[in-house]
Design a protein with these regions (language model features):
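Short amphipathic alpha-helical segments
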Residues: 18-20, 72-75, 99-101, 206-207, ...
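Gly/Ser/Thr-rich active-site loops/lids in small-molecule metabolic enzymes
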Residues: 152-160, 200-231
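Short, glycine/serine-rich, charged loops/turns that create anion-binding
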Residues: 11-12, 93, 197-200, 226-228
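ATP/NTP phosphate-donor binding region
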Residues: 1-62, 69
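Catalytic phosphate-donor-binding core of small-molecule kinases
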Residues: 34, 165-177, 215-241
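Short beta->alpha linker loops
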Residues: 40-44, 63-66, 92, 139, ...
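Catalytic core of DAGKc-family lipid kinases
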Residues: 7, 34, 39, 76-195
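A short acidic, amphipathic alpha-helical/loop segment
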Residues: 48, 70-74, 118
Length: 241
């Protein structure tokens, strides 16, 4: 059997992996010679993926989007020919990237896909020599996912992000900038901007509104001008809902 490395984060989401590892491992070991590694803290998944990539044909990770991001970031520092295939069993708070891949909603079904599914190419972004999986953003609310306590995420799920974001409404500030693109430029004060390859950001679908292809070599850009009054702010949230 080919070798597979299974990385998992027990603290992701609402701790949904606790007590669920046995059937996941059953699905993986049916097709692979499996090595198991529980993540030990921030940065561990990236380091292990990078350091042990040459030992495995496929790396499967289970956790939130952050866990997957770490694995991909670790692998992207390697030459293309040295990167193993990546599988993902979503077990986080919002699981944005799982929505892009139309992965099954249950752990067991997602494990079956990670074990036996055929690989497909996915575009990975690069920003200041760092890789990003599906979004690079600036401005309002971009630190919500990092500053929302894990305990709150485990208790409230996606609602924890909404509540944490609500505390930032009074501190939204514009970022004056000029953005150049093919054929033109736009100058304004933007309170939020993102370069993305996703149909869902922070659990909000429809951002961006147009269809997104994950392997077309193109990323989407969204810029939000600073709202001038509560009505405009309400319109922004309505567009995201």
């Amino acid at each position: 059997m080919d070798k597979l490395l299974f990385l998992y984060n027990l603290h992701a989401g609402k701790g949904m992996l606790r007590g669920k590892l046995a059937p996941i491992l059953d699905a993986l070991t049916e097709h692979w010679d499996v090595t198991v590694h529980p993540t030990r803290g921030p940065g561990d998944a990236a380091a292990v993926a990078h350091d042990r990539a040459g030992e495995f044909k496929r790396i499967v990770c289970s956790g939130g989007d952050g866990t997957l991001h770490e694995v991909v970031s670790g692998l992207m520092t390697l030459p293309e020919g040295e990167r193993p295939e990546v599988g993902y069993i979503p077990a986080g708070t919002t699981n944005d990237f799982a929505k892009n891949l139309s992965l099954p909603g249950t752990l067991n079904e997602a494990a079956a896909v990670a074990a036996a599914g055929a690989p497909r190419p996915v575009d990975i972004g690069s920003f200041n020599d760092q890789s990003f999986l599906y979004v690079a953003a600036f401005g309002a609310f971009t630190d919500v996912a990092y500053n929302t306590p894990q305990q709150a995420k485990n208790l409230l799920g996606h609602l924890a992000y909404v509540m944490e974001g609500a505390t930032r409404l009074g501190s939204i500030q514009p970022h004056p900038m000029t953005v150049e693109y093919d054929g033109g430029a736009v100058s304004d004060g933007f309170c939020y901007g993102m370069v993305s390859n996703t149909i869902s950001v922070g659990g909000f679908k429809g951002t961006p509104a147009q269809p997104v292809a994950l392997d077309d070599g193109l990323f989407e850009v969204a810029l939000v001008r600073q709202p001038q009054n509560p009505l405009q702010l309400q319109g922004i949230f309505k567009a995201l809902a």
